[in-house]
Regions:
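Cytosolic catalytic domains that perform sulfur/thiol-centered chemistry
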Residues: 1-282
């Protein structure tokens, strides 16, 4: 793969840059309830040297009834300052699956105007499988200011998505499994209808990944979007269950040079909750 410190870097790249003074590594592990894993416990047991733990559920808008929505700017700045992550840093984000929740935090940094951030391809599983060094000690943290400039074009709310679905001027791409998209399988969150946003396309995020949890090559990514019926000439809204795996689609779009994309932050956790919003099945 070609390393790009603004999107995706390999474990080899990270190993070569570990001594870079302005490198900041973030463990952004987050798991679905049925995975039966505790990200903070796993981080405390072992993480890449110097990694900080990013709590996706806590660094969010906890006033919202929806899960892990984008946090208020002041909260994000405060948490990053306390973690010692700020201006001038090259950030590398990883997770304990391979390439899963790390993409959400990559997108969140970019939403906040921080472009020097990349996902570690293959994540912690690949790092460990290669016998690279890990530790169980907390990092030494020093406050660092972060200048935030919110890129509002990178996120969409329910009203904007409803308008896009009606006007058909954006592609809406859903990262959930085909069974959930078609409404053949119930949603894991209680109280949600089954199905998908009218006119949306389905591209399960797993189709963008290799079996080892690394992202497929750009040519294969482009082919996957086209096979799903996505018109890459249009701007794209990515969606999923709660705004996590949608960011994998956004990362893939960025890798193929598609710059006009946004995440529907509320995703199906929001759309599936409101009876006045139309739902398609099949």
């Amino acid at each position: 793969m070609s390393d790009d410190p603004k999107t995706l870097v390999s474990t080899d790249w990270l190993a070569r840059h570990m001594s870079m003074p302005d490198l900041r590594i973030i463990d952004a592990s987050w798991y679905l309830p049925d995975m039966g894993r505790d990200p903070k416990t796993e981080y405390d047991e072992a993480h890449i040297l110097g990694a900080r733990f990013f709590d996706i559920d806590e660094i969010s808008d906890t006033r919202s009834a929806l899960p892990h929505m984008v946090p208020p700017v002041e909260k994000f700045m405060s948490r990053m300052r306390a973690m010692g992550v700020g201006d001038g840093h090259q950030v590398v984000v990883y997770d304990g699956v391979g390439l899963f929740s790390a993409a959400r935090v990559w997108w969140l940094f970019r939403l906040m105007g921080q472009s020097n951030v990349a996902v570690l391809d293959g994540g912690f599983p690949k790092w460990k499988a290669e016998g690279r060094e890990v530790e169980d000690l907390p990092p030494v943290l020093r406050d660092r200011h972060m200048t935030v400039s919110v890129q509002n074009h990178m996120v969409k709310d329910v009203t904007q998505v409803a308008a896009a679905a009606k006007l058909k001027d954006w592609e809406i791409v859903d990262a959930r499994s085909p069974a959930r998209f078609k409404g053949e399988e119930p949603e894991p969150r209680a109280g949600l209808r089954s199905g998908h946003i009218p006119g949306s396309k389905n591209l399960h995020y797993k189709h963008l990944l290799n079996t080892d949890g690394t992202m497929r090559a750009p040519a294969e990514l482009r082919q996957a979007f086209e096979a799903a019926g996505v018109d890459l000439e249009k701007p794209t809204i990515t969606s999923c269950g709660s705004g996590v795996t949608a960011a994998i689609l956004s990362l893939a779009l960025e890798r193929i040079g598609h710059r006009r994309h946004a995440v529907y932050d509320g995703s199906w956790a929001e759309w599936g909750m409101y009876d006045d919003l139309k739902v398609e099945t099949g």
